[in-house]
Amino acid sequence: MMTSVYAANLCRLVEEGEVDEHLIDECCLRILELKNKLGLFENPYKDADAEKEKAYNLCPEHRALAKKAAEESFVLLKNDGVLPLDTAKKIAFVGPYTNNHEIKSSWSFTGDSKDCVTIQEAAEKVFDASRTTYAEGCPVIGNDVELIGFTETTPKKYSEEELAAMEQSALQAAKEADLVVMPMGEHYLQSGEATSRAMIDVPEIQMELFRKVLAVNPNVVVVLFN
């Protein structure tokens, strides 16, 4: 990707004598020399190989490195003694990112959401199934919000009955748990190129769920997806 400022104006500027044509030749020559060193004149599609891609795309080494980077990049904002989690206690995972595969973020056009590991999928490998429950609670954004991306627009709309059932299930799980982990945050279409926000807050539908969960169980850990 590049700006169109050069393509749109250089010809005119050369004709008007504002830009020396030799300067353009020098710049083009540097690009051609680099391409020659890379062997692109002999093989313009160098390394663009579907079979080679399979060897390193999502390979164990790369996934392990990505996991390590994620583990070491967490920022703890506050802890009132709830963390680290006591695996002997009953834990409820409540929130729209509990089992949400749409966590690739922007500029992941060739990625497949099914390859993303959700919090629930990871937790099921660590915690005792008899002491953990999972509930979505609410969608990432409410029906009153429409988001527009490069290839998609409006997220799924939920009926009032669906929203009520999701919330009821989440609150019941929160009541019965010793502590609650709430994975929540902004929609992936709210982050990235051309998505500046006037208010960088958590969507209100999630905040409503958070307040209701807090009312039935004060032991809450929030995991923000931003």
Where are these predicted regions, by residue range?
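C-terminal non-catalytic regions of proteins with extracellular/luminal or membrane-system context
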Residues: 3-21, 33-34, 56, 64-226
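Short glycine/proline- and acidic residue-enriched helix-loop micro-motifs
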Residues: 51-60
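Conserved, charged catalytic cores of large soluble enzymes
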Residues: 29, 33-52
